[in-house]
Amino acid sequence: LFPYIWNEIKFNVAYESDLDFVAQTMREIAEEELGEAMLERVRTYTELLAETPVDQLQVMEKPTVIFRVNGNTWLDAIVRYLVRPREAGRIKTRLIRKMLMRLNAEPDRTLFPKTNAR
């Protein structure tokens, strides 16, 4: 039984945002918070996978950021990381607060959609 879960945080950002800045900011904050603990979790995960018939997957050792198109209005900026289930909510809340604080500090680089449909 695998003792961790993959968790995600998603923000909607405008197409005109500085996507490199958004990705770097989200990744850096997640790495600062999770650090070596995530590396250990990934090692455990890959060891467990090696004992299964599942083909070798590429498992990232650090938090990763991906972007997805969300309709015609904005992009989803998503950071993925590995966490213990009991800590998931607390860590997610802490990460969201820190990410929003840093992203909001650069309003010319991080443009959030100006709509009530968020």
Named regions from a protein language model:
Residues L1-R118:
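Structured, soluble regulatory/oligomerization domains located on the cytosolic or IMS-facing side
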